[in-house]
Regions:
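Negatively charged
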Residues: 1-255
Length: 255
């Protein structure tokens, strides 16, 4: 059962739907999303906290570009959902989702990307099956949750995950990124110097603009194995604080 795009760009709709039985719905993609290109202002901000979404497998773009929706979803059972791409992207959603069961999640890219309001505790999220967190918090300028305990062992793409996330300063030293292949733009425009010296970057191929416009970053990453990297373009562009010896890096595969 699908509700894909049901109220997409329905800018005037703001009626109560709290009593709906959505227990058989599997797809809620773009259900209440706005339109970035026309600057349409969505008005939907109703209480749907009691919805039974336990059958939903994808929430992709459900509230993206909806600047007003900010209702409590803390009790939602999202344990069967695998796709959360852009769910709250470019919105102002800022509610507690710390208890969400993300054990089935695989794709979280851009989930809060462009959301300048979101700043909730996500430290206990189980992302052990997630493969993609690209742009997850890009331009989420107030987000500062502790993510040090996240199990990232299955993640392959972290490109832009914290791009211009100005408030973010979590310890990421224990992240397992051994399966990651792309980390372009990862810390671009950030204001902290993460201790990532021990990261296993041996499978990385793309480091484009990774530290671009970082004014603080100056960690010793001299021991990084970058032998598989093919793209380092603009990697340290305008990284005004960086001054470490990386003379021993093997850049023979960079093209």
């Amino acid at each position: 059962v699908s509700m894909v795009g049901m109220f997409s760009e329905a800018t005037s709709f703001n009626q109560p739907l709290g009593n709906w039985d959505v227990s058989n719905v599997t797809d809620m993609r773009s259900m209440f999303n706005g339109n970035n290109w026309t600057d349409d202002d969505m008005t939907f901000n109703q209480d749907i906290s009691s919805w039974n979404v336990s059958s939903v497998t994808t929430f992709q773009y459900m509230f993206v570009h909806n600047p007003v929706f900010n209702s409590d979803l803390s009790s939602w059972d999202v344990s069967n959902a695998s796709i959360f791409i852009g769910m709250f992207g470019a919105s102002n959603f800022n509610q507690d989702v710390s208890s969400w069961d993300l054990s089935s999640a695989t794709q979280l890219q851009s989930m809060f990307g462009g959301n300048a309001s979101f700043n909730q505790d996500l430290s206990d999220w189980d992302i052990s099956n997630v493969t993609n967190i690209a742009d997850m918090f890009a331009y989420a300028t107030t987000f500062e949750s502790d993510l040090s305990g996240w199990n990232t062992s299955n993640v392959t793409n972290i490109s832009g995950a914290f791009k211009y996330a100005a408030a973010f300063e979590s310890d990421l030293s224990n992240w397992d990124i051994s399966n990651v292949t792309s980390m372009s733009y990862l810390f671009a425009g950030t204001n902290f110097s993460p201790n990532i010296a021990s990261w296993d970057v041996s499978n990385i191929t793309d480091m484009e603009r990774m530290f671009r416009n970082t004014t603080v970053f100056n960690e010793d990453i001299s021991d990084w194995n970058v032998s598989n990297v093919t793209n380092m373009s603009l990697m340290f562009m305008n990284a005004t604080g960086f001054n470490q010896d990386i003379s021993d890096w093997d850049v023979s595969n960079v093209t």
